[in-house]
């Protein structure tokens, strides 16, 4: 070979280069496949807090009281209570990464019909205490504290307390009903998965490829928080014997909501909304229909 002339590269060189490239791409793909869900799960452990600001039930012309709830695990939760005028009251549980203002208009509708409404910031959200959000696994403790508060109110009949939850709040509300048969009725919107086992209820093929990565992310949360993996809703819901359920579902929640409505041993009504994706806006999208269905449901079971 003459000086300055580049050496010739044979087939072996290019074959090795191809193998190396394929291996690098495969490793990167695996890291992305498992890494992205874990990164998402880790970021969800410490959600941002959104301030309440100057918003309050007074903006809707409602009288209210500031309340402080204490959970069984000694966290203080802060909220508002709009007194009942008909002897019944509803606990309102907002969605993840929000605060009590996310259920303010639901409270306004309830108050219009005489129902008391207890809105609070769930743990790690708004003004409430809590440092780690473990995918909502412990949020049922917040719902329990809210129910205990209402049972102490002189104007509330302890047998006429309902729970209304949105998205993550829906999961917490539904699970609480599996533990407390004193709840008179449950309205949940956007109810999806509490655990990986619940995710398997979702029959959409698009999820199949992500199942191993999702499973790993759930295990990561258990390891990171030290909080034991909870009972899946699919196992807990059959414990409901008498509490009536109203499940409101858009496309993304249809499979799970349908399953929960069939698994319960109590009365269940499923309102299927022809809306794409994950939705918790029924009150705003269909206000008259929401009022007819939700208030009608509560009137039936809390009368």
What feature does the model see in each segment?
Residues 16-70:
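An N-terminal hydrophobic leader/cap segment in hydrolases
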Residues 72-83:
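A short loop-to-beta-strand scaffold at the N-terminal edge of the catalytic core in hydrolase folds
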Residues 69, 80, 98, 225-301:
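Serine-hydrolase catalytic core
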Residues 102, 133-154:
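Alpha/beta-hydrolase active-site loop
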Residues 148-167:
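Gly/Ser-rich "nucleophile elbow"/oxyanion-hole loop immediately N-terminal to the catalytic nucleophile
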Residues 175-226, 238-240, 283:
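Hydrolase active-site cap/lid region
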Residues 87-95:
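Short beta-strand element of the alpha/beta-hydrolase
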